[in-house]
From Swiss-Prot:
Belongs to the tRNA nucleotidyltransferase/poly(A) polymerase family. Bacterial CCA-adding enzyme type 3 subfamily. SUPFAM superfamilies: Nucleotidyltransferase, Poly A polymerase C-terminal region-like. CTP binds at residues 26, 29, 110, 153, 156, 159, 162. One of its GO terms (biological process) is RNA repair. This is CCA-adding enzyme. Catalyzes the addition and repair of the essential 3'-terminal CCA sequence in tRNAs without using a nucleic acid template. Adds these three nucleotides in the order of C, C, and A to the tRNA nucleotide-73, using CTP and ATP as substrates and producing inorganic pyrophosphate. tRNA 3'-terminal CCA addition is required both for tRNA processing and repair. Also involved in tRNA surveillance by mediating tandem CCA addition to generate a CCACCA at the 3' terminus of unstable tRNAs. While stable tRNAs receive only 3'-terminal CCA, unstable tRNAs are marked with CCACCA and rapidly degraded.
Amino acid sequence: MERFKKASSIIETLKQQGHEAYFVGGSVRDLIIDRPIGDIDIATSALPEEVMAIFPRHVPVGLEHGTVIVVENGEPYEVTTFRTESEYEDFRRPSSVQFVRSLEEDLKRRDFTMNAIAMTEEGKMVDLFAGQEAIQKREIMTVGNAADRFQEDALRMMRGIRFVSTLGFSLETKTKQAIETYGHLLEHIAIERITVEFEKLLTGTYCVKALKELVETKLFSHLPYLQMSEEKLLKATQYKWDSFEADIEAWAFFLYCIGEEHPAVFLRQWKFSNKKIKDIVAVLLTIRKRKEKDWDTVLLYKTGIHIAEMAERVYEAMIESYDHTAVNRVQTLFQALPIKNRQEMNVTGNDLLNWASKKPGPWVAEMIQKIEEAIVQGNVVNEKECIREWLQECNLL
């Protein structure tokens, strides 16, 4: 409750000004579950302009949705006006938002009962939709009619299965049936938004359970490049998933599990940045080399520590060894390298031109590469004079 106490002065101030205010959303849910708490959000009957007038230190981040960030005790908190939403457009966004003075009206527009619990600054729960009961049953259940909630915003179906992965809860029967019925509406949602949810699913503690739900609800058939992948996904559930430290690792492991032969093509369908695609593919290529042999200085140097660490974690998950000292060994080997990158070489192309008295040409880059490999392999010390002597001994000058 300590973090809520730091924010309670916002609620107290709003109430002193004649408004209602409560803690709401995921932070309240996680407090009940006893999970680490993320951002703390506050809902209030005060209109956005009233919130801004009461709190001088504020940032008007989403006034059309009623949200103002209030800075209190050095921490930012989202304060959002109670609201209802009109008819939804394209199964993803409301055509308009109306501010209201009723907490119940605000809570009943939310996705799942576990996320529709409010809490006073004293810690008293306001649970109008049996959210605590759902948490006790470890069930993910929509607020009101599941068909209505998913037709309002189809992304809620992906969120539901993402919560299976992060919380280990199960989909309530009617909620699950509605996902099976309305899964096709997910095709109206921007790929980028789906990717965010799927990434959280892949990095969740209960990922295997969530992947099984994707298959059972047939929701996978409306995801990019997975339309015909039921057998592949079931194959992925046979692996023991570790909790990966980076989303790149999780994607690499997932692509390995489903046996994806064209990872770059797959990832482009999910609208990843070129940088992220490059990193995930690099991890997969490194794992392929790692399967053939253990790390040596040349492989580690060419790979770089960032990709090498991720590749080793994924490799350990693939072979189900879960040797948590393996990455430490990679780090130790990398620290022992004579140089970590080409910029640390104590020789330049100009040095070679001066020593050889030859015209510039492709030979300079080729020679730099030979010197680089020799330094990494320990065949020559990374000192200018030593490098010159080595070149002469090898008749390379």
